[in-house]
């Protein structure tokens, strides 16, 4: 009996002790996504993810490469499988459900949603210094312009959205005009060029820089001028492309290799001066290709010119 009484008393004391403890303990796992993204570190983490498609799929597997350059006389199907990727190499059976085009479309818009979140949430940050925040936003806008330039160059007048992704899908998207798309792309790239440094943020070679923004800006001007005859304040996009390209060359010393063989030289593979930026993977200090599978080694075996024999 005494043993039972002692056990009950001990249990009662333990319960009373627990009820007396403070319930205001800090539990970081209870923070909401909005709370995390209201901090500089949280937003920086999301901003880093804006790069993920570059090393994850766009430049490490065949899909984007086949969409970007398929249909030209530079590419052929592999000898042992003439039907492989024929939809994008020969436009044989190309349809809306072709995997390569679907993957590119979905990944570009996914990254655009992340870029939009960074741009829009930067004003809500509760910490961080202004220069670092501006740099992250400039990078996000540069990447957003890059992804939109891929979309408009591949699919024409797509839907322009500057809002982050939500749980509710838009079932009736509306196409924007080519002029609206190029105006936004150019506005983003001008902002990036004015706010990024010559050296990458955190000395991370995978991050975009002023050179990236200016190079993309010149290319976008050339695309808009050549494909659609666009103008800006009465000036041809072609003229704008020339001005930006000359600015890059004269002010920043950007140039091409004298010998095209140097473009493909192994010694220049990870530090190529013609590159606008590097799809380096999540660890930019690792010089190995993070997401290269065995299939990646075959990509250029489908290329007729054989650049490694130049």
Question: Model-predicted segments: where are they?
Answer:
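Elongated scaffold/linker segments in the mid-to-C-terminal portions of large proteins
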Residues: 47, 85-91, 95-105, 243-250, ...
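Bacterial Sec-dependent N-terminal signal peptides
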Residues: 1-29
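Short coil/turn linking the two alpha-helices of tandem helical-hairpin repeats
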Residues: 152-153, 159, 200, 223-232
């Amino acid at each position: 009996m005494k043993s039972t009484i002692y056990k009950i008393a001990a249990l009662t004391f333990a319960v009373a002790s627990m009820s007396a403890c403070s319930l205001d303990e800090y539990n970081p796992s209870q923070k909401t996504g909005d709370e995390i993204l209201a901090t500089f570190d949280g937003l920086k983490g999301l901003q880093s993810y804006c790069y993920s498609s570059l090393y994850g799929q766009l430049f490490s597997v065949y899909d984007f490469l086949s969409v970007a350059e398929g249909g030209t006389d530079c590419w052929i199907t592999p000898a042992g499988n003439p039907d492989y990727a024929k939809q994008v190499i020969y436009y044989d059976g190309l349809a809306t459900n072709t995997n390569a085009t679907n993957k590119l479309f979905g990944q570009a818009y996914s990254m655009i949603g992340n870029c939009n979140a960074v741009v829009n949430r930067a004003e809500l940050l509760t910490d961080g210094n202004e220069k670092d925040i501006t740099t992250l936003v400039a990078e996000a806008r540069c990447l957003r312009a890059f992804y939109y330039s891929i979309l408009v160059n591949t699919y024409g007048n797509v839907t322009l959205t500057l809002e982050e992704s939500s749980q509710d899908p838009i079932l009736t998207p509306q196409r924007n005009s080519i002029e609206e798309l190029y105006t936004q792309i150019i506005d983003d790239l001008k902002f990036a060029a004015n706010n990024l440094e010559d050296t990458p943020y955190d000395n991370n070679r995978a991050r975009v820089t002023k050179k990236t923004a200016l190079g993309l800006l010149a290319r976008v001007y050339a695309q808009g001028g050549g494909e659609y005859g666009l103008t800006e304040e009465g000036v041809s996009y072609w003229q704008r492309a020339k001005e930006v390209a000359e600015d890059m060359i004269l002010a920043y010393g950007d140039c091409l290799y004298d010998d095209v063989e140097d473009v493909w030289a192994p010694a220049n593979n990870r530090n190529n001066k013609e590159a606008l930026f590097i799809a380096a993977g999540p660890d930019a200090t690792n010089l190995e290709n993070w997401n290269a599978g065995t299939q990646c080694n075959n990509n250029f075996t489908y290329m007729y010119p054989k650049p490694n024999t130049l």
